[in-house]
Amino acid sequence: MTVPNSEDAHVLIIGAGITGLILAQSLKKAGIRYSIFEKEVSMNYRSNEWTMAIHWSLDRLRDLLPADRFAHMESVSCNPDVALDAGGNYPIIHGETGHLIAGVPYAKGLRVPRSKMRDLCSKGIDVQYGKNLIDVAFTESQKGVVAVFDDGSMASGTILIGADGPRSKVREFAMGSAEKAAVSRFPIFHTNMTVTYNDAEKARSYHAFQSISSMPDGPDHPESWVFHLAMAWFMDHGQPATYRERLDMIREKAQSLAEPARSSFTWIPDDTQVHKADISYWVTQPWDNRQGRLTLIGDAAHPMPPYRGQGLNHCICDTSHLLASIRKVVAGTASLKEAITAYEAEMIPRGREEVKCSVENGYMLHDWDQVRESPVFRQGFRPMSGHDRGSVDGHEKMQPKDIAAN
């Protein structure tokens, strides 16, 4: 296969979430041509919000982003008053007693709201919105790939990268069917909500590292602090359907919690939108990369439950490795097939290991008899190594019809 140079190499990125945008920023910084497509109609049009941790991948992110983008990282932090290299211990607290169970150490890092991180990474990136991928075609010459969208438009490139999240359409093409690419359900009822108490004393009483989402008016105005709250429990049937029904159930369950958690949930304003998050995963496995012309990155490659703070870190790690592989292709030191196959050889087992670990950790964190043996207690925030035991392949598969119904 002919090796493209920097002038004719063209990377097609499907998905303008955080991972796709970081990849676009890194390609732009490297002088490699790209186009990025997003099926949503605009940036951050969804009302749902959540926060994510960046820790062991922070140095990789610094290398990937242009200096002027990384310089603003502290400004998008959930708590901009805390330096990136401050470090500390992430508290794990027994909800019913209020006692500290453990402190998970981290040397550097931060938490970021999804919307702010996405906005930071979108600056200077020309995202083509409203582009819903329906087909991927490969030229007979084996020199390119074509993305086909539902509005009738097409885009040609050297390689197509699926950065389109847990329910990736690109993964369906890579695996050859929607069934093989389908995520599995994690059987938990997981709620999350964005809360402003509009009361300084209430906000101060629940000032915790893991719950602050943003401080719009700074640390001296707690009445404006925005909190990201979540409550989850195993529940298969009788799930509340409306925001208010979910809030009523949360308030009821909160009565068994110790302070300040009990009041923090009881005080949630009546008009709060309590979202239900469909927690799912896909155990990473090899796919057909079509001579290096099709691959996956981030949540499209290894969607996992959010119970060890690893997801975004692996997305950033993927981007670092993938950029290095594309650079080799552009430099002429590796063919596209060689470079992408090497990228996948590192990423696939790493992703598979972490997905299995996060599933295991999710079960163990909801079982008092096992919680102290869970990966987050044994390993902390460090990336796993060699954790690939047990099987989660037998869980119920979430098919496209199920996804559409939620």
Go through the PLM ranges and name each one.
Residues 2-9, 29, 70-74, 78-85, ...:
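C-terminal helical "tail/cap" subdomain of flavin- and related membrane-associated enzymes
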Residues 2-11, 26, 51-194, 240, ...:
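Conserved N-terminal helical subregion
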Residues 13-33, 37, 161-162, 191, ...:
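Conserved mid-domain beta->alpha element of the FAD-binding
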Residues 19, 42, 167:
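Conserved Rossmann-like nucleotide-cofactor binding loop
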Residues 44, 136, 304-305:
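Short, solvent-exposed loop/turn segments at secondary-structure junctions
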Residues 46-50, 241, 307-310:
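Short, solvent-exposed loop/turn segments at secondary-structure boundaries
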Residues 47-50, 173, 202-205, 355-356, ...:
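Short aromatic-enriched loop/helix-cap "lid" or pocket-rim segments at secondary-structure transitions
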Residues 95, 99-105, 153, 188-272:
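Conserved FAD/dinucleotide-binding core of flavoprotein oxidoreductases
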